[in-house]
């Protein structure tokens, strides 16, 4: 099963190489797509260098900053066009542990969204100030209650989608950005009967 890790970037030149090296060090059968929103700090150029150094790394350059949600939608479309079976969302800033990729992948199957949750047993956050944790927990609680969702961590960005599921979604209609993008995608999964 071909798996693609999507890493949207905007001004990540100081952390991108380390993040890519850590993902590739897991020695999993996967490829990485860096989606750069025309970062002024040189992230796009570094991404190109990394793609030359590592054949399993590709780069999608976008002409302007369009936001996280649009970056992921572009990555989903690219993954579908390239024939990948699964797509993993992963932050380029190192906030998701590459060592958890194997666990995330092992739970994936054709009709399941897998979320690397921070707020379930075994989950945790690292290097977050207390107020960011409070905001995240409160936002998740509010979203779950208002939307009637059983998902414990609706705003988590470390996820694995089957591309067959993504093909059935109206991705061109997804509007939300930031944490709202994760919530909207979670609701789409629920609406389409994804586990």
Question: Language-model segments: what does each one mean?
Answer:
Residues 2-4, 31, 184:
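Cell-envelope/extracellular polymer assembly enzymes that use nucleotide-activated donors
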Residues 7, 30-39, 60-61, 90:
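Short beta-strand/loop segment that forms part of the nucleotide-sugar
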Residues 12-25:
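Short, well-formed alpha-helical segments that are part of the catalytic scaffolds
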Residues 23, 37-38, 66, 75:
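Conserved short acidic donor-positioning loop in nucleotide-sugar-dependent glycosyltransferases
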Residues 36-45, 94:
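A conserved acidic beta->alpha catalytic loop
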Residues 62-81, 86, 98-179:
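Acceptor/aglycone-binding surface of glycosyltransferases and processive sugar-polymer synthases
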Residues 104, 192-195:
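Short, intrinsically disordered, charge-balanced linker/junction segments flanking boundaries
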Residues 181-188:
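Short active-site alpha-helical segment characteristic of glycosyltransferases
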């Amino acid at each position: 099963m071909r798996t693609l890790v999507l890493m949207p970037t905007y001004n990540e030149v100081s952390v991108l190489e380390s993040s890519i090296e850590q993902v590739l060090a897991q020695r999993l059968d996967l490829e990485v797509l860096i989606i750069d929103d025309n970062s002024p700090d040189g992230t796009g150029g570094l991404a190109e260098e990394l793609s030359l150094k590592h054949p399993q790394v590709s780069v999608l350059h976008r002409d302007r900053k369009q936001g996280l949600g649009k970056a992921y939608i572009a990555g989903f479309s690219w993954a579908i066009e390239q024939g990948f079976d699964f797509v993993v969302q992963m932050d380029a800033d190192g906030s998701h542990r590459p060592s958890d990729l194997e666990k995330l992948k092992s739970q994936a199957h054709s009709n399941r969204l897998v979320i690397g949750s921070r707020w379930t047993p075994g989950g945790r956050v690292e290097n977050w100030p207390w107020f960011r944790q409070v905001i995240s927990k409160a936002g998740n609680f509010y979203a779950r209650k208002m939307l009637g969702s059983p998902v414990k961590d609706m705003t988590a960005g470390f996820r694995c989608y089957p591309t067959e599921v993504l093909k059935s979604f109206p991705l061109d209609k997804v509007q939300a950005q930031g944490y709202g993008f994760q919530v909207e995608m979670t609701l789409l999964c629920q609406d389409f009967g994804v586990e």
